[in-house]
Design a protein with these regions (language model features):
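Extreme N-terminal basic, low-complexity initiation segments
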Residues: 2-14
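N-terminal glycine-/serine-/threonine-rich phosphate-binding loop
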Residues: 42-86, 95-105, 217-221
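Short hydrophobic targeting helices and cationic amphipathic motifs
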Residues: 10, 21-23, 41
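Short, active-site-adjacent cap segments at secondary-structure transitions
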Residues: 54-56, 90-94, 156-159, 233-235
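Conserved mixed alpha/beta catalytic, RNA-binding, or beta-rich assembly cores of soluble enzyme
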Residues: 54-56, 224-243
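Ligand-binding beta-strand-loop-alpha-helix segment within the catalytic cores
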Residues: 103-225
Length: 243
């Protein structure tokens, strides 16, 4: 509601896992139709939210999972929906952050990458796979539509309580020794029963989508849009600057 994105339908992915990948989208609302002799299907917007299980963890898993998701998304497009897609980035952003920090350790002339930059990278490479997977599926059906990924920032409140209680898990599972090493670095770590330990970071609530007008313009032009991956890159306003 805060973003005013004019969304009429919401789809959410189930917890099925890549190895049991069935229909990953749950229909919450259905389209309305006009009445009388002129009854017609009114084009409506839908949001498809892909959780981390619908994307896999490794690059090969992601490519397989994206092909499956693309089929269901293409079905919606064939039915006349305008489609916006958002996605999780929990495993991916953690792997990127670890890789960038390990590189900085090996090459001291480079500084570690902040989480915001890693989030932007994850939007890019997940969007790349989704964009090409959906485009390919549409072309296989003889549908010629543009699929675009929008690098998306969200403005957050610097005083959000979430900054004091990190809850968003990221990266791979760790053993107890690795978890202790992370804690020594000042990072927050939680234990998931029977699975191991994972790092957690803050997940403040979005106040406003910075690129909202661009997303709406693309949807108005009947393009398929991938946006706000990982919930968006959290930024704070400071005068005319975002940081």
């Amino acid at each position: 509601n805060n973003s005013k994105l004019s969304i009429s339908y919401l789809f959410a992915d189930t917890d099925g896992g890549c190895e049991n990948f069935h229909l990953p989208l749950q229909i919450i609302c259905r389209p309305e139709r006009g009445g009388g002799n002129g009854e017609h299907f009114m084009k409506k917007r839908v949001v498809v939210a892909l959780g981390h299980r619908a994307l896999g963890t490794t690059l090969p898993e992601q490519k397989v999972a994206v092909k499956q998701s693309a089929k269901y998304i293409a079905d919606l497009i064939e039915e006349g929906y305008q489609v916006a897609i958002t996605h999780s980035n929990a495993p991916q952003v953690g792997m990127i952050h670890t890789a960038m920090n390990e590189f900085a350790k090996a090459h001291p002339e480079y500084t570690p990458a902040p989480m915001s930059v890693c989030s932007a990278m994850s939007q890019g490479y997940i969007g790349y796979d989704l964009q090409n997977g959906i485009r390919e599926e549409l072309l296989n059906r003889g549908i010629y539509r543009t699929v675009s990924t929008v690098l998306t920032q969200v403005i957050v409140d610097p005083y959000d309580d979430a900054f004091y209680t990190p809850t968003k898990v990221l990266g791979r599972y760790m053993n107890a020794q690795e978890a202790n090493e992370e804690r020594k670095k000042g990072n927050y770590v939680i234990e998931e029963a029977g699975k191991g330990f994972r790092r957690v970071v803050s997940a403040p609530n979005p106040v406003k989508i910075v690129e909202l007008d661009a997303v709406n313009a693309l949807l108005d032009a009947d393009q398929i849009v991938i946006a706000a991956g990982g919930g968006g890159i959290p930024v704070m306003e400071q005068d005319n600057h975002l940081k």
